[in-house]
A protein has these predicted regions:
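Metal- or metallocofactor-binding catalytic centers and their adjacent structured scaffolds
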Residues: 12, 17, 49-127
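Conserved active-site and cofactor/substrate-binding residues in soluble primary-metabolism enzymes
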Residues: 41, 66-69, 73, 87, ...
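N-terminal accessory beta-strand-rich subdomains and adjacent acidic, glycine-rich linkers
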Residues: 6-7, 24, 37, 70-73, ...
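Metal-dependent enolase-superfamily TIM-barrel catalytic cores that perform enediolate-based chemistry
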Residues: 141-196
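Short glycine/proline-enriched loop/turn "hinge" motifs that connect secondary-structure elements
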Residues: 38, 136-138, 167
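Structured beta-strand/loop patches that form or line metal/cofactor-binding pockets in enzymes
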Residues: 8-52, 57, 61-63
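Glycine-rich, aromatic-flanked loop segments that form ligand/cofactor-binding clefts
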Residues: 117-153
Length: 196
């Protein structure tokens, strides 16, 4: 069975404190989506400090600036429950799910828990002096990546140039394209333009 004890052959880590910072990063290409236009990208940076001196880090991308404060408060609230306790990811998850029963186990609270979970796994991998993939039983290696930094719901006549620029930016062989125009025919036309 998949248990924290079976996975981790490392020292036990204990939560000492958590540091949460926020940032807003200007985008090279504004996001144009059904929910509106975004010119900046909010980030929540999470550092979990352990009594053993290991720092686990993670970050969240909450999309909407207005949700940042609520997520930060939820992260702090959850982290306060585990101060001075062992950082065992599955135990932290289970205890968090129990404590979130009345306020809800979705949306902002689950996003907050995800940030804590990633930082814990980062700390455990650092303590074991192994890549996280190895700690989880896998092996690190190259993965195929694609550029997601564009091709939002922009006018069709802008898509070909943007797709070419996205491929060139990092020598990518693929790009991510967003759909959701007024009609399915417009989406099909957009796909055809980008494929060229």
């Amino acid at each position: 069975s998949f248990t924290t004890k079976a996975l981790l052959v490392t020292q036990q880590l204990t939560l000492e404190k958590i540091q949460i910072r926020t940032a807003s990063v200007p985008l090279n290409r504004p996001i144009v989506a059904k929910v509106g236009q975004l010119k900046d990208w909010p980030l929540i940076l999470i550092d979990i400090y352990t009594k053993e001196g290991v720092v686990g880090r993670s970050y969240l991308e909450p999309y909407r600036q207005r949700s940042v404060a609520a997520i930060v408060h939820s992260i702090q609230d959850l982290a306060d429950m585990f101060k001075g306790k062992p950082l065992a990811p599955l135990d932290v998850y289970a205890e968090s799910m129990r404590s979130l029963h009345l306020v809800g186990r979705e949306g902002i609270t689950l996003i907050a828990l995800a940030g804590i979970d990633m930082a814990i796994w980062d700390a455990l991998a650092k303590a074991a002096n192994k890549p996280l993939a190895t700690l989880l039983g896998g092996s690190p290696g190259p993965i195929r990546a694609y550029n997601t930094n564009g091709l939002w719901l922009k006018p069709l006549d802008e898509l070909a140039d943007e797709a070419a620029a996205l491929v060139e930016e990092g020598n990518y062989s693929a790009v991510k394209m967003r759909l959701g125009r007024e009609t399915i025919q417009q989406d099909a036309q957009a796909i055809a333009i980008v494929r060229e």
